[in-house]
Amino acid sequence: FGTIFLTPLFGSIYDKYGKGATLMIIGSCLLTFVHVMFALPINSWVLAIVLMLILGIAFGLVPSAMWPSVPKIIPMKLLGTAYALIFYIQNIGLALIPVWIGKVNQANTGVDGVIDYTQTMTIFAAFGVIAIIISFLLLFEDKRKGYGLQKPNVK
């Protein structure tokens, strides 16, 4: 729910101050942190609420920096193709990952019907680590080629 308000806020921060790759790194680190914490055997509703709030911040940070960064990296004549490929990959993930996670949850369901989500959260944390790596690669590539990911969009 927080991403509804936070994504435009973070987008305006990116427009004004830049630091797109940094915002993606921070968001990816927060995402990973939350899933690692959820994988731990801690049973606290207060912690769960705090972690969900942090997750909302992470889900606001990453797209607010990712989408406006695409035209900085991809030539204008290939921008439609680039966005199409991004949505294509995203839709593959939306189609296949829930099936995989469902199988993992089913395999981790005890005879009493209680599901152990440790492996599921570890998978999501691994996706977060991949996002961190990709974000750092974008930062390094931006420094090398000068795409302007760290520069503001509005002057």
Language-model regions, residue ranges each:
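Residue-level signature of mid-helix packing/kink "hotspots" within the transmembrane helices
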Residues: 3-8, 91, 95
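Helix-to-loop junctions at the C-terminal end of transmembrane segments
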Residues: 6-19, 105
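Residue-level hotspots within transmembrane alpha-helices of multi-pass secondary transporters
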Residues: 8-12, 99, 133
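C-terminal transmembrane helical hairpin of 12-TM major facilitator-type secondary transporters
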Residues: 20-66
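Multi-pass alpha-helical transporter architecture, strongest
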Residues: 39, 122-155
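Intracellular helix-loop hinge segments at the cytoplasmic ends of transmembrane helices
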Residues: 67-73
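A late C-terminal transmembrane helix in Major Facilitator Superfamily
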Residues: 76-110
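A membrane-interface helix-boundary motif in multi-pass transporters
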Residues: 103-128
